[in-house]
């Protein structure tokens, strides 16, 4: 069968590449065309063709999007025309809601007009539970099946909006399970791991406070910064200059997590990775205009928590020190609470079991691929 995939950023390219590999296992005759990146190209091999690289269209923020709007619109037009010409059995949208929902709306119109016979699937639901909830009408109107990688999204879509979706498993949990599968021995040395984010601004905002908060523990714990891929070591140098006992490691995040006693983590996927390794953590995220951000979070942003761990558990498993709660003293106090002997450590480890249970043991891309091939095979018989 013919599969057309659209991924508009690096994370989408990675997730889509795993899905392509799984689809090939389920459907050895599969062929692919896609808007995506190098990972998808490698996964598809001779079975695939990249129409356009995501870096040509990956603009974030109002001003960059506005400045590059002609390029983005040309990309949409090219994508629509290519799909109409190739006539795939299905189109699989991967996150990247702004671009993908525009294309999906057009394709649904062509399907309704009898000019296209294809199924429209969405792999990795956009986070409309936090922002732009009105987009639910687009999914109901245009998408045949939604595949989610976050278990709490099922209640949001189905209970609140009466829109059935499929939770297929979580890729982060998959990766941690795969990493832990070989017999690994945890190190004996007690350690505190600092995960200050993957973007320069995040690192600049969060790392100094993380270092200052953890410094009093340097005699009892080794303190290590997990360097982000794509950020050169020189960028970190000013932060650790004259800091006794603090080191930085690159390309070893999972090794470091598998041996960590506790962690300070900037919000994002890293919070879920840390929980999957059963490492107690404090979530730290410095923001501009703290009071304003807190007000917006309480009144505009439609979710109770910022960390995936708490969202999945639907309770405060880990402390979230962001906006007006972010301070060196607060981080230090919460870190002390989750170190051995601290009053919050065991409860957090117990609560992690709820997170593991809700994530399940399904391999997300394999599960999604099985369902997609089954749905397509079934639809072609009728």
Tell what function each PLM region has:
Residues 1-382:
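Nucleotide-activated sugar donor-binding and catalytic core shared by glycosyltransferases
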């Amino acid at each position: 069968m013919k599969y057309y995939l659209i991924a508009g950023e690096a994370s989408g390219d990675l997730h889509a590449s795993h899905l392509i590999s799984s689809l090939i296992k389920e459907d050895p005759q599969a062929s692919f065309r896609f808007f995506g990146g190098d990972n998808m190209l490698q996964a598809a091999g001779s079975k695939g063709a990249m129409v356009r690289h995501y870096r040509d269209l990956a603009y974030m923020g109002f001003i960059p999007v506005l400045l590059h709007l002609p390029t983005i619109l040309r990309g949409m037009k090219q994508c629509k025309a290519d799909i109409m010409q190739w006539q795939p059995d299905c189109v699989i949208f991967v996150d990247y809601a702004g671009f993908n929902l525009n294309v999906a709306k057009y394709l649904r119109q062509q399907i309704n007009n009898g000019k296209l016979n294809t199924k429209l699937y969405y792999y990795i639901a956009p986070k409309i539970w936090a922002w732009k909830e009105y987009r639910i009408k687009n999914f109901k109107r245009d998408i045949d099946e939604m595949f989610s990688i976050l278990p709490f999204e099922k209640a949001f879509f189905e209970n609140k909006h009466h829109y059935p979706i499929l939770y297929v498993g979580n890729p982060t949990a998959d990766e941690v399970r795969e990493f832990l599968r070989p017999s690994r021995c945890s190190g004996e040395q007690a350690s505190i791991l600092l995960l200050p984010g993957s973007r320069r601004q995040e690192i600049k905002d969060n790392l100094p406070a993380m270092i200052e908060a953890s410094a009093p523990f340097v005699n009892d714990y080794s303190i290590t910064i997990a360097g982000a891929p794509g950020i050169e070591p020189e960028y970190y140098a000013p932060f650790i200059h004259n800091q006794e006992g603090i080191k930085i490691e690159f390309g070893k995040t999972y090794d470091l997590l598998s041996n960590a006693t506790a962690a300070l983590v900037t919000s994002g996927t890293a919070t879920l990775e840390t929980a999957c390794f059963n490492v107690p953590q404090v979530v730290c995220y410095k923001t501009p205009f703290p009071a304003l951000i807190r007000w917006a979070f309480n009144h505009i942003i439609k979710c109770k928590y910022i960390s995936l761990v708490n969202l999945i558990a639907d309770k405060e498993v880990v402390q979230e020190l962001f906006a007006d709660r972010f301070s060196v003293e607060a981080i230090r106090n919460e870190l002390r609470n989750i170190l051995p002997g601290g009053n919050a450590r065991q409860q957090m480890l117990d609560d992690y079991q709820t997170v593991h249970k809700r994530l399940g043991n399904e391999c997300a891309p394999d599960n999604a691929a099985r369902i997609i091939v089954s749905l397509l095979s079934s639809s072609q018989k009728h």
